[in-house]
Amino acid sequence: MDYNVQHVDKRHAAGFHLVGPWEQTVPQGFEQLMKWVDEHAVQPLEWVAVYYGNPQETPPEKLEADTVVSVSADFHLPADGEGAITTEIAAGQYAIARVRVSNDDFGMSWQAFFAALLGDGKTIDPARACFEVYLNDGYSDGFWDIDMHIPVQ
């Protein structure tokens, strides 16, 4: 798998924090996020999923994720935030790979990316979260083009 390592600036984000199996919570979170963005006329810079924890070590019901849009640093939540949060995605060195995901099989792409990094002797930074940036509307296109980000030391 092709990837590059580069410094990524901090991102400001707004959206929803979820707990549970990613294959269930992330799609639900994006449905909630799309509705929230539309209802509050939020102007997203990017659509992003942030993943916390290691699914090989953490039980599925305890996995955490954020479904968010990146926003300007001066963004403020609407008064009726409907459970939305603001958060930041940490700056630092990240390995970044661009992939096309078919059949909603995001896990396979992530596993291949981790295997490539570990095979190349890269050290993953557990203090920062992994995240993916969506480059297209997979609901209408039938596939997802994403940039996967894994924090490295």
Swiss-Prot record:
GO annotations of cellular component type: cytoplasm
SUPFAM superfamilies per the UniProt record, alphabetical: Probable bacterial effector-binding domain
UniProt keyword Cytoplasm present: yes
Main location as per UniProt: cytoplasm
HAMAP family, sorted: DNA_gyrase_inhibitor (MF_01896)
Keywords (A to Z) from UniProt: Cytoplasm, Stress response
Functional summary from the UniProt entry: Inhibits the supercoiling activity of DNA gyrase. Acts by inhibiting DNA gyrase at an early step, prior to (or at the step of) binding of DNA by the gyrase. It protects cells against toxins that target DNA gyrase, by inhibiting activity of these toxins and reducing the formation of lethal double-strand breaks in the cell.
Domain of life: Bacteria
Protein name: DNA gyrase inhibitor 1
Pfam family, one: GyrI-like
Record localization: Cytoplasm
Coiled coil stretches, renumbered: none
Gene source species: Dickeya dadantii (strain 3937)
GO molecular function, one term: DNA topoisomerase type II (double strand cut, ATP-hydrolyzing) inhibitor activity
NCBIfam families per UniProt: PRK10016.1 (NF007451)
Subunit: Interacts with DNA gyrase.
Family recorded in the similarity comment: Belongs to the DNA gyrase inhibitor family.
